[in-house]
């Protein structure tokens, strides 16, 4: 029911409207992969959202469930996992500002980042 309600809201946007999609869970299963244990999935979602980034013309997709800060690219769209992590992972010498990063305007691309690139963020 929640997916259908959100799709109905997206469908009301004027043609060509760019979006910023924000969701607690990642929209795609391929974004919920533990690099050290790739056979184990931490996916908690639905495949019905897998194409929202292209179907609803997202400039960026933001989520935070995984507790693994990262920047990933899929289909030319940037996906930001912006969790602050668990308190035990916080470095006491840093402030919350040290953990923040720009969403828009988009930061400049990093050389070598191409389609399906992943950069895990360790602060």
Predicted regions and their residues:
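Active-site-proximal loop/helix segment associated with metal-binding centers of metalloenzymes
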Residues: 1-20, 25-36, 114-121
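Hydrophobic "anchor" residues on beta-strands that sit immediately upstream
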Residues: 20, 60-61
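Divalent metal-coordination and catalytic microenvironments
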Residues: 21-24, 65, 79
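Binuclear metal-dependent phosphoesterase catalytic core
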Residues: 33, 40-42, 46-59, 67-123
